[in-house]
Amino acid sequence: MTLLNNTWTLLLLCFLAGLGLSAGQDIHQMQYHLEKLTSVRHPFGADPNAREAARSYIKEQFQQYGLEVAVHTFSTTVWHQGQQRTVAGENVIGVSEGAGGGPLLLVGADYDTALNRHPLEDNGAGVGAMLEVARNYMAATGPDGVFTRNSTVIFVAFDLNTLEYDGSTGEPGAYHFVHQWLWPHLNQSLLKFAGAIILDSISKINMDQNSQYLPQDFGKAFPSAYKRISEDGNKGDFLALVTRGTSQSKRLKDTFTGNYLKRRKAGLIRLQELVVHTNSPVSIPTLEMINHQAHYHFWTFQPSDQLTALPALLLTDTDFYRKSSEECPLPCSAEAFLTRQRKQSLALTCSGVLYTLLDMQAERRRPGETGEVTSGASVGVTLAMTWLLAAVAAILH
């Protein structure tokens, strides 16, 4: 292995250490999550047990982390073999109750798949990232952590994203969750909701020119983003942050952006904001780029005659609008899927989400309080120190 590759490996390992547990353990944990998500998870897929197995795994992980697990059941319709079929779905919810009573914050990802999609790209990596954020958040705010849980955080694995199923007209699991579980849980009060962070297709990075497709009229909806992407040769070298330009969304967007950029180093994946302003209608081609993920059901929530838009941001690689530079033909193992570039990208995304939760929903313990950090549960390792250690190790090597 070359010195450059050694350096990148060490930088990555140390970067992951800042997420909360030892770097090797984080890499192992992410791979372990993805190994449970390598199969197509569709109600009429080749393996009828794959979706149930993934659901059971998510529940087990939530329980191990110390989250209070709830299950929200619903029914919807799925188009299959020329007819609409009614199917049952389960949204899996893990609740970390806060003591301070502030507005709750949500992190979510779809855990099912369409029949013709890559199960790790869409959306196994998103589920794995959500699980890692949940694991590290609970460790950071647990007995050995340096934070206390002030406001509630909930982690949600959504089932049956029918908007990605060809020809299906049934409402997806995220829609039913917002209407049937979340809104009653909030006592129908927008003031009790800090927002949602949705992870949907986050692993495709491509540094090649013309690897990023932009829909017609994309430039009208997102002029600054269009200019940046075009001038950069239409490269798929960014993580897109899709949000609405409302005051309710601003704090969530700014907190995540600050945490992401603070931990991003040269060469790592940049962040591209796509802000949908209420006074600037988005054309249908561009809207179709951002309306099939779970966040959209928060934006369009309408419990009565009046629209009650809930703040939510989407983190995405833009899904099928981007060509992957690291194909992993099916069946694709978790080990083969987790290339160096994907590890870097997923680590940065997890870190940004984790520190957003800690900033918004937790409080750092004061000196002398119980809960001093142990080596296995620390999120206090500074990134400056880890990068320095990586550089020194590379030189010594």
Enumerate the language-model features and the residues they cover:
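Acidic/histidine-rich catalytic neighborhood of metal-dependent amide-processing enzymes
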Residues: 114-248
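A non-catalytic alpha/beta surface segment that caps or lines the substrate-entry region
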Residues: 32-99, 273
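Cleavable N-terminal signal peptides of Sec/SRP-targeted secreted and luminal proteins
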Residues: 5-24, 382-396
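C-terminal GPI-anchoring signal of eukaryotic secretory precursors
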Residues: 365-386
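Second-shell loop/turn segments in exported
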Residues: 24, 39-52, 79-83, 114-124, ...
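Structural recognition of the beta-strand scaffold that forms the well-ordered cores
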Residues: 71, 93, 104-108, 154-157, ...
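Active-site-adjacent substrate-binding region
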Residues: 195, 202-368
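N-terminal capping segment at the start of a domain
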Residues: 20-55, 59, 65, 112-113, ...
